[in-house]
């Protein structure tokens, strides 16, 4: 295999960044695959995601020229390429997008000429191989390509509104129905006449001859609700170019899977699966999915059964299923990671740093899925064998998903390979029904949001609560109820109040929202029961009006519940110390996965692969309390994001940060945090862990208390200790030794009791044999045995069977008013005519009991009383009837 070296993927990356750095661009790192504070987006799926707020006007950046290589994922939600991966030349779950951006600085002239310079001069692409498209009314771009760059007119294609509506075009970009939009120009590479396909805009444009390599978007309009376009005061540029697609062209291969990066991964997959044919599509799937899975785990996503974690689990399981198809029955997928690090670790140091954690996560998932895959394939085969029309019923696909953990796209994948399909309508119907059943009503206020139009009219809430817990002059800018916006509200109404400023902290970063009161000078009073953040920038006071009324424009005073805020601050600072201690004890793979910072407790979820031993728990608790006793000053600074990271600050999973961040330092703990904290660590007083458990694969949870709550917990534990000491006749200091003596004594007595029971059973057997009734040459024994439990009854039953070759036996052990029943049928004379389970039901129903078993043995129970005697007395008659 000949892997080209002149333009490796690594060199293409560095060429791109170096080129735009020399053009005055700030080089920024790739944003995480998990978008911060954007619930509408499952994953970062394009280069513009991290700059979305800039284009919407919600975020200001100091840099006006930026370039980056953005990691992207399309494997869930609206943008989902998962089904196509491995079967086409250019679909991937994970891909890298090269992009350069202008925020009100340069525009079309620079973007177009620089793109041409990079492609033809740096990367040496023949100009005659390039073709460009422009929006049909974008005469400016057309003229720049023709007159300044020199592209012949027959290589410039105007694309109109080809999607059925005004401005609905491949060459007109818009973020939504309203807002920033504009024309785009795309650069295509022509593979030559020997490849089928026509130029863009032609009937044959879907062929492989002309491949889009770079899209230059010119955001120059603001689209109004009536469809009109208003010029933006500061037009922007947004460009995107797929690294893998470009590498295929520069390396003179026709599919992305033939480039150097993928060939290295495919060779490794072939080695791990012992497959000689490197063209095997399953190897492509494994190679592609190794990148997606590794980078998702690096960015804090772990396999689970919901949300992003479920998408990761689906990708892992799809790769494992393709390994299974190749005959692999042992874990292998995790061993792709070292090769991935070798080809991408230099560009992404975070991948190199997290390699061990990634491998452990993948290995755990492989071991978990091995049995599921085996069982799921058997079920699929059974279903497929019964299908006559080639369509797997949606109900069966849902059963595979819900009961056996088989993602539906995996079922569809297998079906497709067999020339079948899945009834997705039926599957979605079953899924919808399950969601309806499981859905619970949400808390008031959490589901209410502002419209984008209304939000654009408001300025973000100014938070005063770091310095003050009471503030006057808070102007009401909006009122919301479950029905949406309202202009006013009166006594008894529950509303969400938005003010221009507030001392109330809005729930975020795991810290609960503040409570308190909002008041006006005319006696108006609102009880604030929660504070939620709306659209990431507005503080919504969830309140009930207890006196007077409130309307938009009113001016209020706000008071936060001080004692509660302080208790929350204690717990928030304690989570920082706990996080630091966990990383110190277990290593840097420990990353916060979620938290709850409430006034009465804290909950901290973190990545770790095994339960925490008691000794480790003690060590962690001691380390936190050492930091508490050190009484460190809690220092809070505002600084640039990069400066904070250079200073060692930890950025938390799932959080979005701006250019300037708030850095909280206490002792050796340094974190980016927008929450509220104490002044000194000594204010925490005492830190006490109250529980530790696993919440999902690779995620552990610690719950703890601080301050007075911790003291109360310790006092309660001490009280329980004294209670236990009193119950066993010991003092508190000697409880453990005393309990050890009691347990030793208990074990001795239990052994003696077993011996006595054995003797009792031996004597009982002799008595029972003497009471046996002969019914048609079958011995029938039906007896009450006081004091014998189920285990002793079964032993007595087994001994009787050894001495009675043809017998029907019913034994009733009575203890504390409860009856344990066992029945047995032994020997050829009775077997087949008398069934032990039927006999047991006959007896049990007479004593308000029940049970079950086999034809030769059954067990159950019931209640003691006069009916037991008559039930046992009637056994011989019942047996006689069945034998005859």
Curated annotation (Swiss-Prot):
Known cofactor(s): Zn(2+)
Alphabetized CDD domains for the sequence: AlaRS_core
Catalytic activity: tRNA(Ala) + L-alanine + ATP = L-alanyl-tRNA(Ala) + AMP + diphosphate
Listed GO CC annotations: cytosol
Entry EC number(s): 6.1.1.7
UniProt keyword annotations, A-Z: Aminoacyl-tRNA synthetase, ATP-binding, Cytoplasm, Ligase, Metal-binding, Nucleotide-binding, Protein biosynthesis, RNA-binding, tRNA-binding, Zinc
Gene responsible for this protein: alaS
InterPro entries assigned to the protein according to its UniProt record, in alphabetical order: aa-tRNA-synth_II/BPL/LPL (IPR045864), Ala-tRNA-lgiase_IIc (IPR002318), Ala-tRNA-ligase_IIc_anticod-bd (IPR018162), Ala-tRNA-synth_IIc_core (IPR018165), Ala-tRNA-synth_IIc_N (IPR018164), Ala-tRNA_ligase (IPR050058), Ala_tRNA_ligase_euk/bac (IPR023033), DHHA1_dom (IPR003156)
Name the UniProt record assigns to this protein: Alanine--tRNA ligase
Family: Belongs to the class-II aminoacyl-tRNA synthetase family.
Keyword Cytoplasm part of the UniProt annotation: yes
Gene3D superfamilies: 2.40.30.130, 3.10.310.40, 3.30.54.20, 6.10.250.550, Bira Bifunctional Protein, Domain 2, Threonyl-trna Synthetase, Chain A, domain 2
Pfam family, one: tRNA-synt_2c
Domain remarks in the Swiss-Prot or TrEMBL record: Consists of three domains; the N-terminal catalytic domain, the editing domain and the C-terminal C-Ala domain. The editing domain removes incorrectly charged amino acids, while the C-Ala domain, along with tRNA(Ala), serves as a bridge to cooperatively bring together the editing and aminoacylation centers thus stimulating deacylation of misacylated tRNAs.
GO molecular-function term, one example from the UniProt record: ATP binding
Subcellular location: Cytoplasm
Disulfide bonds: none
Reported function: Catalyzes the attachment of alanine to tRNA(Ala) in a two-step reaction: alanine is first activated by ATP to form Ala-AMP and then transferred to the acceptor end of tRNA(Ala). Also edits incorrectly charged Ser-tRNA(Ala) and Gly-tRNA(Ala) via its editing domain.
Manner of cofactor binding, per the entry note: Binds 1 zinc ion per subunit.
PANTHER family reported for this sequence: ALANINE--TRNA LIGASE, CYTOPLASMIC (PTHR11777:SF9), ALANYL-TRNA SYNTHETASE (PTHR11777)
Recorded superkingdom: Bacteria
Chain sites annotated for binding Zn(2+): 572, 576, 673, 677
GO terms under biological process: alanyl-tRNA aminoacylation; negative regulation of DNA-templated transcription
Principal subcellular localisation of the protein: cytoplasm
């Amino acid at each position: 295999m000949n892997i080209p070296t002149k333009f490796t993927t690594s060199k293409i990356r560095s060429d791109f960044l170096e080129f735009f750095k020399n053009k005055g661009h700030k080089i920024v790192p790739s944003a995480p695959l998990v978008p911060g504070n954007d619930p509408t987006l499952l994953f970062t799926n394009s280069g513009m995601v991290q700059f979305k707020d800039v284009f919407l006007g919600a975020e200001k950046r100091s840099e006006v020229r930026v370039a980056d290589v953005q990691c992207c994922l399309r494997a869930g939600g609206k943008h989902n390429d998962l089904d196509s991966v491995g079967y086409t030349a250019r679909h991937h779950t994970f891909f890298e997008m090269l992009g350069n951006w202008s925020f009100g600085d340069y525009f079309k002239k620079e973007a177009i000429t620089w793109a041409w310079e990079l492609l033809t001069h740096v990367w040496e692409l023949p100009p005659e191989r390039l073709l460009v498209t422009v929006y049909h009314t974008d005469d400016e771009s057309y003229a720049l390509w023709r007159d300044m760059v020199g592209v012949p007119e027959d290589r410039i294609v105007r694309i109109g509104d080809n999607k059925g509506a005004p401005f609905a075009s491949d060459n007109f970009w818009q973020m939504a129905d309203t807002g920033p939009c504009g024309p785009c120009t795309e650069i295509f590479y022509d593979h030559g006449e020997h490849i089928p396909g026509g130029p863009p805009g032609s009937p044959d444009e879907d062929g492989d001859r002309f491949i889009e390599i770079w899209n230059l978007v010119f955001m120059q309009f603001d689209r109004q609700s009536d469809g009109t376009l208003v010029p933006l005061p500061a037009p922007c540029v947004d460009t995107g170019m797929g690294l893998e697609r470009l590498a295929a062209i520069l390396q003179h291969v026709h599919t992305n899977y033939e480039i150097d990066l993928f060939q290295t991964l495919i060779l490794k997959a072939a080695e791990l699966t012992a497959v000689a044919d490197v063209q095997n599509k399953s190897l492509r799937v494994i190679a592609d999915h190794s990148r997606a899975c590794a980078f998702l785990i690096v960015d804090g996503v772990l396999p689970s059964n919901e949300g992003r974690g479920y998408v990761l689990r689906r990708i892992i399981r799809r790769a494992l299923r393709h390994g299974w198809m190749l005959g692999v029955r042992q874990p292998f997928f995790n061993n792709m990671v070292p090769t991935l690090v070798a080809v991408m670790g230099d560009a992404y140091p975070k991948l190199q740093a997290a390699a061990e954690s990634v491998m452990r996560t993948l290995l755990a998932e492989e071991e978990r899925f091995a049995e599921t895959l085996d069982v799921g394939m058997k079920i699929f085969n059974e279903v497929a064998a019964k299908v006559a029309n080639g369509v797997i019923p949606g109900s069966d696909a849902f059963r595979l998903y819900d009961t056996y953990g088989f993602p539906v796209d995996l079922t569809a994948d297998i079906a497709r390979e067999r020339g079948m399909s899945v009834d997705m309508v039926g599957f979605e119907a079953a899924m919808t029904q399950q969601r309806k059943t499981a859905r619970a009503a949400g808390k008031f206020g959490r589901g209410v949001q502002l419209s984008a139009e209304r939000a654009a009219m408001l300025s973000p809430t100014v938070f005063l609560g770091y310095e003050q817990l009471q503030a006057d002059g808070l102007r009401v800018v909006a009122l919301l109820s479950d029905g949406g916006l309202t202009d006013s509200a009166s006594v008894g109404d529950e509303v969400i109040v938005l003010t221009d400023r507030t001392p109330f902290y809005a729930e975020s970063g795991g810290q609960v929202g503040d409570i308190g009161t909002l008041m006006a000078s005319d006696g108006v009073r609102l009880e604030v029961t929660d504070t939620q953040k709306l659209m990431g920038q507005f503080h919504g006071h969830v309140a009930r009006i207890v006196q007077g009324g409130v309307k938009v424009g009113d001016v209020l005073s706000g008071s936060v519940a001080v004692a509660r805020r302080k208790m929350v601050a204690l717990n928030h600072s304690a989570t920082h110390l706990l996080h630091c201690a966990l990383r110190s004890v277990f290593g840097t793979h420990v990353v916060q996965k979620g938290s709850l910072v409430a006034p009465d407790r804290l909950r901290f979820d973190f990545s770790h692969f095994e339960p925490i031993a008691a000794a480790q728990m003690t060590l962690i608790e001691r380390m936190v309390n050492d930091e508490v006793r050190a009484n460190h000053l809690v220092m809070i600074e505002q600084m640039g994001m990069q400066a904070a990271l250079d200073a060692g600050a930890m950025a938390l999973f799932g959080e979005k940060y701006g250019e300037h961040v708030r850095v909280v330092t206490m002792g050796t703990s340094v974190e980016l945090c927008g929450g509220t904290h104490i002044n000194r660590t000594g204010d925490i007083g005492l830190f006490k862990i109250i529980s530790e458990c696993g919440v999902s694969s690779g995620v552990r949870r610690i719950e703890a208390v601080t301050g007075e709550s911790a003291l109360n917990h310790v006092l309660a534990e001490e009280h329980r200790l004294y209670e236990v000491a009193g119950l066993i006749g010991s003092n508190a200091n000697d409880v453990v030794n005393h309990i050890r003596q009691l347990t030793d004594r208990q074990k001795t007595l239990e052994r003696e009791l077993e011996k006595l029971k054995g003797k009792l059973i031996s004597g009982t057997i002799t008595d029972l044999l003497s009471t046996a009734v002969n019914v048609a040459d079958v011995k029938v024994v039906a007896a009450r045995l006081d004091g014998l439990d189920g285990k002793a009854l079964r032993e007595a039953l087994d001994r009787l069977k050894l001495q009675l070759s043809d017998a029907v036996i019913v034994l009733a052990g009575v203890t504390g008013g409860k009856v344990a029943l066992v029945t047995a049928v032994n020997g050829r004379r009775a077997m087949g005519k008398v069934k032990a389970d039927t006999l047991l039901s006959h007896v049990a129903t007479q004593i308000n009991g029940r049970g079950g078993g086999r034809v030769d043995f059954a067990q159950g129970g019931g209640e003691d009383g006069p009916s037991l005697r008559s039930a046992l007395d009637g056994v011989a008659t019942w047996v006689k009837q069945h034998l005859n």
